[in-house]
Amino acid sequence: MKEIKSPFLRTIYEYGLITVSIWIMVVGIYFFKFPNHFAFGGITGFSTVVSQLTHWSASDFTSVTNTALLLLGFLFLGKGFGLKTVYATMVMSVSLSLLERFCPLSAPLTSQPLLELMFAIFLPAVGTAILFNIGASSGGTDIIAMILKKYSSMNIGTVLMLVDIASVVASYFIFGVETGLFSTIGLAAKSLVIDYVIENINLCKCFNIICDDPKPICDFIINGLNRSATVYHAEGAFTHHDKTVIMTTMKRSQALKLRNYIKRVEPTAFMLISNSSEIIGKGFLAN
């Protein structure tokens, strides 16, 4: 994430992102996941199963459970409990409750469960990836993970996976084999989609440029793209001619400009361009 110098503006920016990401998740959960009884994905997956066995709706049970987990978080984690997680959990609970009251659904939006499964996977995954990228979470089973991490030596990933698997297995018996199979696909695809979205959110281009005259290229990087670079001297293994290597990293939109500029002013330059989704330092991810 780009650095924002003002603490106030940075806070506004981050909480704005949290709000948008939660709304994206809520749309996927409420309009696509709950009506089709897709029972994967932590608390919302568990709520889908519980709603079929009790008088609770999936939205109401999710809201109540998230609120209870918030209280447990304050009780067991105290000051270590993140405000971003509290805010995200409250926004999700309120949003689901409002949709339940003002936009009730009695059936899926379409007759294509596979299409709706794609949205039930993709939208929450995008929201989760955005939250993860700014160091927040949507609460739910994440709060359980925080408590387990503090008070036990249990493998948190295994515990959370078992919760997801239990919900999916229950869906076979409660909703039928077809819904159970869809839930299994959703569980398998969820993590892959989250990882893919996170990588693409942070994707940058890394340049290693070998050239004879570094000055115009460095000037363009600094003045034209507002980036910096590291320059070091090298020697060609075959020609033994002196060469200069320029190493720099930038966003994809800037990378295209730099590549075109180098082709125009230094056509003999050798460029090695690679992707990176985790660059830590000034101008990129915070330490």
PLM regions and their residue ranges:
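Peripheral (non-transmembrane) domains and long loops of multi-pass membrane proteins
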Residues: 1-5, 201-287
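Core subunits and conserved enzymes of cellular information-processing
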Residues: 2-213, 224
